[in-house]
Every structure is written in structure tokens, then in C-alpha cells.
Amino acid sequence: KEYRRQRQMCIRDRIRTRDLLGLDTQIVGVVSSAADAFARSLEAGQIVTTETADTFADGMACRIPQPEAFEIIRAGAARIVRVSDEEIARAMRIYHEDTHNTAEGAGAAGLAALYQERERQRGRRVGVILSGANIDRQQYARVLAEG
């Protein structure tokens, strides 16, 4: 529970930092399509809970958005992109093969979203944050073997 709360704070803190620095950087959130309570909440303009959050990217398995984080994200995020477990796994493999970095599912989600939006982002300066390598070795081996 604490880990998921910290994940919600991750985008919140980036929004706050951007605002404190007076930047106009667009910040895009990413959620698992199987755990999209935050995306649904932003679309509804109020907190929406989900019955399940069935994703292997456990750092994104949020069913109930934290109110403080929701308010900051609603006010400061450009949008939220939903990514599938398959897209997350692909991003994990890209990090492993191309940069020799280990990324957990939630940590690779930003790259998955960027890949999904590659045409929309073409020609733009984009930053992606890789965070977290907290993944079970057997699960990581399965993800790598799928590619």
C-alpha cells in the first residue's frame, strides 16, 4: 500500500517541481490499462475507484487514487496514457537490450507510453524517466524470454 502511494506521489512531485521552477513542460501520466483508476478519475473529473488492478506492473496497481495526488495531477498533468501489460513488457525488453538497464513494469511504463505515442511525439523534445528495478527475477526472466 505504501509503495503504491509513493508511485502516485511520483508524478505529483514532478508536477510540483515543474511549477516551482516556473516551467511550461507538459507532464504526461501513465497507467496500466488493467489498473486505470487515475485515467478514469481524470476523465470523470472526480475520483473513480475500480474493482481490480490486474497488472504484473504492481507499482501501477492502483484501484483507489489518493485524493491529494488526484487534485495535483488533475490540475497539472497534460493527460494520462493507458498502456497494456504487453507494451510494458516490450519497454522492459528495450531497456534491457538497448541500454542494459533493468526496469520493473512501472519503471518502464513511460517508455511504453512514448512508444505508443511515437507519431504524436515525432520531432518534439521528450524526456522519459526510468525508475525502479524492483522485480522478481523469475518474472523478469519470463518478460525477457517473451521477446
Where are these regions (language model features)?
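Active-site-adjacent helical/loop segments in soluble small-molecule enzymes
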Residues: 66-123
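Glycine-rich beta-alpha junction loops
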Residues: 8, 31-36, 54-56, 64-66, ...
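Phosphate-binding loop/pocket of nucleotide- and phosphate-handling active sites
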Residues: 109-147
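Anionic-ligand binding region
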Residues: 17-18, 26, 37-60, 65
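Short Gly/Thr/Asp-enriched flexible loops that form oxyanion-binding sites at enzyme active sites
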Residues: 12-22
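Single conserved hydrophobic/aromatic residue that forms the stacking wall/gate
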Residues: 1-11
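Residues at the starts of beta-strands that form the adenosine-phosphate
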Residues: 24-26, 125
